Amino acid sequence: MAFTGKFEMESEKNYDEFMKLLGLPSDVVEKSRNIKIVTEIKQDGQDFTWSHHYSGGQIMTNKFTIGKESEIQTFGGKKFKAVVNMEGGKVVANFPNYQHTSEIKGDKLVEVSSIGGVTYERVSKRLA
């Protein structure tokens, strides 16, 4: 499957600006800056299980089916209902305050989120 795999974060751009625009408190932004994130994706046709494993043991998992409404949890911990779509090989979700896209480029998982003119990009390398 195109997205199935385990990916370790290797770089990010515009972290501080994006998290502040999301409304996260500065102490949370500071504390989260150097957290190691491993993303594990399991894709079975249109069904996805998308987990972020954070250093310290916290895990955030979202399960969704492309084109169907699902409950999704955001970076900030908020939960809401959304339809996740596949557009041109990218997984696309419109969160309440921002749009998020994910795609596989070679052995990299590239995640891009945009809010108020700021674009946050996280690139993770494939581990498995």
Curated annotation (Swiss-Prot):
The modification N-acetylalanine is found at residue 2. Its main location: cytoplasm. GO terms for molecular function: lipid binding. It is a peripheral membrane protein. One of its GO terms (cellular component) is cytoplasm. It comes from the Eukaryota. Keywords: Acetylation, Cytoplasm, Lipid-binding, Membrane, Transport. InterPro entries: Calycin, Fatty_acid-bd, ILBP. It is found in: Cytoplasm; Membrane. Expressed in ileum. Coiled coil: none annotated. Belongs to the calycin superfamily. Fatty-acid binding protein (FABP) family. Forms a beta-barrel structure that accommodates hydrophobic ligands in its interior. Can bind at least two ligands per molecule, however, the stoichiometry is debated. Binds to bile acids and is involved in enterohepatic bile acid metabolism. Required for efficient apical to basolateral transport of conjugated bile acids in ileal enterocytes. Stimulates gastric acid and pepsinogen secretion. This is Gastrotropin. The lineage of its organism: Eukaryota, Metazoa, Chordata, Craniata, Vertebrata.
